[in-house]
């Protein structure tokens, strides 16, 4: 695969004339008719975010579609509109204000929203998604304006198929669904977790090029155990404690069956921010019957593995020679560990069980060891190794002597000065990944990692941090952001018509991402490529994933494209305005 080495490139994969959805790929070469239930015109056209262009409507379009007098006389092109909006957004003092401004734009002018996001992805990504989306979910009831997805609740049991049919789009390719029980590191936010599927799917379109009309955000509302929300007069969800057990399982099963019945075999269902006990169970239950993906387990694992594979060039040692210690043994931690073990098993030509022996996990009760096995949850048991009990992280570091420290605990500042110094005393180049988000939950900051390691740490985080200067050298830490992986991963599934997700596809995605890191990136201390080239990166990931789907016999779109990278690029949604007949 060809590397993307120019970190200053705009994310400008424009899409081709005909995309994978079998229609015009939003290019300006073809005039189109703004169909709704009827041809939109006049005031209704200005109110339709799919077709509204604001002041960019041409003189001819204003006459043809009865817009004369409904707009000021000036005609502004999309580039100038984008410049004006970016200036306006930069005037806001607080990230949540910027988030609300972007949401309002998305609801008013869809193409301008995506054009702005694609062209300014590094600046706006922390606003559209983590960390700002966490605050937006906490205050979702207060800032709610209009629905952007489907809300399915216990009240809809027995009629979920009818609810799905209420959604106006029929050709759905990607669904992101949450039950709101574990939103980022913020806990149970109930129905207000809808901000997560909406934000994730905005990135599927902006970064991965999946058409917005093919994306469906869904919240499954089974109640909330958050007393603050239950007592909030502006809370928008069911005011009851969470349903569990059979009642919960039956609702989810009805949803999964209805999705398959309504949208077919090839629709991707991404589980998002489910609590650990449900996340693993749902993935295991439906992975053989549906095209399912859990970003918290599989997406996080793939992006972290990519960083570790990339870092091999800085540590000068293969992954199989490393020893890993995790703080956090939930869905993220165990998912990452499992994918690392799979990768090492292929690298060493050994069994996954043998590879697991190089990976240790610490949970709230200390190091996971064999003597604790009877009391462990099932998903933790494969990581229980023979060792005497160790109560805390620092003790585990001294006992295990890891070369890689990975945090997925959700406990802010748990990588203390003593922890970083201990890692630095063991390793010349300690590899430290503080993955928890939002920023307040990060195990340490970039400044702490570089300062306490005396500039020797190789560092990546789950939340964004500013560059750090230490003893005259500037270190640019990179964010191990799932947004590197899931948009391109999803696009790869779409263009191949995949019917199932296989672990080898996750490895393929990780290898594709690692292959995009340039020499210039490494010199700055980065183990991930610049986000400014994310669309080109996503195309490479999509091509790798699609190729693997064809190799595994899981691709349903035949014949196989001759040039899969070109196919991925030409399938991408373009937000450039179209001319109307």
Swiss-Prot record:
Expression sites (tissue/organ): Specifically expressed in roots (only in steles of secondary roots).
Annotated NADP(+) binding sites: 182, 296, 325-341, 437
Domain of life: Eukaryota
Site (Important for activity): 296
Keywords for the protein's UniProt record, in alphabetical order: Cytoplasm, Metal-binding, NADP, Oxidoreductase
Catalytic activity: (S)-malate + NADP(+) = pyruvate + CO2 + NADPH; oxaloacetate + H(+) = pyruvate + CO2
GO biological process: malate metabolic process
GO cellular component: cytosol; mitochondrion
Cofactor names: Mg(2+); Mn(2+)
Top EC group: oxidoreductase
This enzyme's EC code(s): 1.1.1.40
Cell compartments where the protein resides: Cytoplasm
Residues that bind a divalent metal cation: 272-273, 296
Protein's UniProt keywords contain Lipoprotein: no
Record GO terms (molecular function): malate dehydrogenase (decarboxylating) (NADP+) activity; metal ion binding; NAD binding; oxaloacetate decarboxylase activity
InterPro entries given in the database record: Aminoacid_DH-like_N_sf (IPR046346), Malic_enzyme_CS (IPR015884), Malic_N_dom (IPR012301), Malic_N_dom_sf (IPR037062), Malic_NAD-bd (IPR012302), Malic_OxRdtase (IPR001891), NAD(P)-bd_dom_sf (IPR036291)
Co-factor binding comment: Divalent metal cations. Prefers magnesium or manganese.
Any single Pfam family the record assigns to this protein: malic
Residues the record marks as active site: 129 (proton donor), 200 (proton acceptor)
Name assigned to this protein: NADP-dependent malic enzyme 1
Species in which this protein is naturally found: Arabidopsis thaliana
